[in-house]
């Protein structure tokens, strides 16, 4: 790290502002007017004027201060030492470190220095400097070479970058050349008025002094843009702290952006409590009997991390006296299969007697000798699905409770037979009418044929 010039000895005219420096070079042009629109600029831009003749350089500063200081280490203050440390305090409003003093870009003093402008900004400045506000590609090359000598010895790839920016960037558009103009091959390029302001803002935000070391990104030069953000403004440029940098002993948190989001630590105790809460809510839903498919709304923030499916909302908790625990995904089909097996093992009368029980008998749960043989009564399944069976009875016919074979062999009731007979009779009646109509049409067709044949003869 080289010697540092104190801020008190620093020259006042370290650079020129956008509205003053560039406007002197492009006096009376639209480019200078565009840059003078905003007066809130707090950073200078380089002086890119290249005038002929000898000129006294006013940018150089007297170096007598360097000889006055015997011990250079004493000139390093606390702010300089803190700029080296990776652990920073972004809330400290300390001034910028003099270690990274803002030296203006001067093409005359250091022609081999790369200009800190993007190619879109270079194209924008070249087009805005032209009187007609439109230039061909070769004139853009000439303008860049004239004002930035760095590109004279630079690799030829920068011309490809200029062409790519012209063709791919929406800020530039191709215009037709006039007949009076003789520009040779190529097209004219101009600035799209819709995106002109974007280019001006990009030019104003361009850092005119690139950081010499990566420490510039970690130096404390001002508070963050918003609380908890990783961006901070330094020397008029928006910089970002590296994600790996630890600040104040912890990584950067964006609580300022998302005030409602807060980290919830998940511990084994919390997971156990969540499981207990879910079991309790399941039992409460069993007692209150909510409608099927209704969403579960909880005001407890601990229960926000629990989820309930449509199947679990219809589940019922097993009674303590039952031998087996039924899963939440049990449906009416499982009940029918279970009933079929019970009827095959026992007698048909036992199952029908179980279906014919009244509600008081089901509530009292007094097992009869026939119920003792029933598998539903033994497993406690009936006590678990009382209300489901009650609703199923209203929409079931007696034949639904029988096995599949007996449903096929069972005769339909008399009312169904009468309806089927009436339907068959109506169909036969319609078929008879249609056959009669067909016979009549056939007879008429034959008669007409015979008449035609006799007429021909």
UniProtKB/Swiss-Prot annotation:
Molecular-function GO terms, alphabetical: DNA-binding transcription factor activity; sequence-specific DNA binding
InterPro entries tied to this protein: FH_FOXN3, Fork_head_dom, FOXN2/3-like, TF_fork_head_CS_1, TF_fork_head_CS_2, WH-like_DNA-bd_sf, WH_DNA-bd_sf
Subunit: Interacts through its C-terminus with the C-terminus of SNW1/SKIP.
Organism: Mus musculus (Mouse)
Annotated protein name in UniProt: Forkhead box protein N3
Basic residues composition-biased segments: 384-396
PROSITE patterns hit by this protein: FORK_HEAD_1, FORK_HEAD_2, FORK_HEAD_3
Functional description taken from the UniProt entry: Acts as a transcriptional repressor. May be involved in DNA damage-inducible cell cycle arrests (checkpoints).
BP-aspect Gene Ontology terms: craniofacial suture morphogenesis; mitotic G2 DNA damage checkpoint signaling; negative regulation of DNA-templated transcription
Gene3D superfamilies documented for this protein: Winged helix-like DNA-binding domain superfamily/Winged helix DNA-binding domain
Entry coiled-coil feature ranges: none
């Amino acid at each position: 790290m080289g010697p540092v010039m104190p801020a008190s000895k620093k020259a006042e005219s370290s650079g020129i502002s956008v509205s003053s420096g560039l406007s002197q070079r492009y006096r009376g042009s639209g480019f200078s007017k565009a840059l003078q629109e905003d007066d809130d600029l707090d950073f200078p831009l380089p002086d890119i004027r290249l005038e002929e003749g000898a000129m006294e350089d006013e940018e150089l500063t007297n170096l007598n201060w360097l000889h006055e200081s015997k011990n250079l280490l004493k000139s390093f203050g606390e702010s300089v030492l803190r700029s080296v440390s990776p652990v920073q305090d972004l809330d400290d409003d300390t001034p910028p470190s003099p270690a990274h003093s803002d030296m203006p870009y001067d093409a005359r003093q250091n022609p081999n220095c790369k200009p800190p402008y993007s190619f879109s900004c270079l194209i924008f400045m070249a087009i805005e400097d032209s009187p007609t506000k439109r230039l061909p590609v070769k004139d853009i090359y000439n303008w860049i070479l004239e004002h930035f000598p760095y590109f004279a010895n630079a690799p030829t790839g920068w011309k490809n970058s200029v062409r790519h920016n012209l063709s791919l960037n929406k800020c530039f558009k191709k215009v037709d050349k006039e007949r009076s103009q003789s520009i040779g091959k190529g097209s004219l390029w101009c600035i799209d008025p819709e995106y002109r302001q974007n280019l001006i803002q990009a030019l104003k935000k361009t850092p005119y002094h690139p950081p010499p070391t990566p420490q510039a990104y970690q130096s404390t030069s001002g508070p963050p843009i918003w609380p908890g953000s990783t961006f901070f403004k330094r020397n008029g440029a928006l910089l970002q702290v590296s994600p790996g940098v630890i600040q104040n002993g912890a990584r950067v948190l964006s609580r300022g952006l998302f005030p409602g989001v807060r980290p919830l630590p998940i511990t084994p105790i919390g997971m156990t409590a969540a499981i207990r809460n879910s079991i309790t809510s399941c039992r409460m839903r069993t007692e209150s009997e909510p409608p099927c498919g209704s969403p579960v709304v909880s005001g407890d923030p601990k229960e926000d991390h629990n989820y309930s499916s449509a199947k679990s909302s219809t589940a019922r908790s097993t009674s303590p006296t039952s031998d087996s625990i039924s899963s939440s995904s049990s449906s009416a089909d499982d009940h029918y299969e279970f009933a079929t097996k019970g009827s095959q093992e026992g007698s048909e009368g036992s199952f029908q007697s179980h279906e014919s029980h009244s509600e008081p008998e089901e509530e009292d749960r007094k097992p009869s000798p026939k119920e003792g043989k029933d598998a539903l009564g033994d497993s406690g399944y009936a006590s678990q699905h009382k209300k489901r069976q009650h609703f199923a009875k209203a929409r079931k016919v007696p034949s639904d409770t029988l096995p599949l074979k007996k449903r096929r062999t069972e005769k339909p009731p008399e009312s169904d037979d009468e309806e089927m007979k009436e339907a068959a009779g109506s169909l036969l009646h319609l078929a008879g009418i249609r056959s009669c109509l067909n016979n009549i049409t056939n007879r008429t067709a034959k008669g007409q044929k015979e008449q035609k044949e006799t007429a021909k003869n």
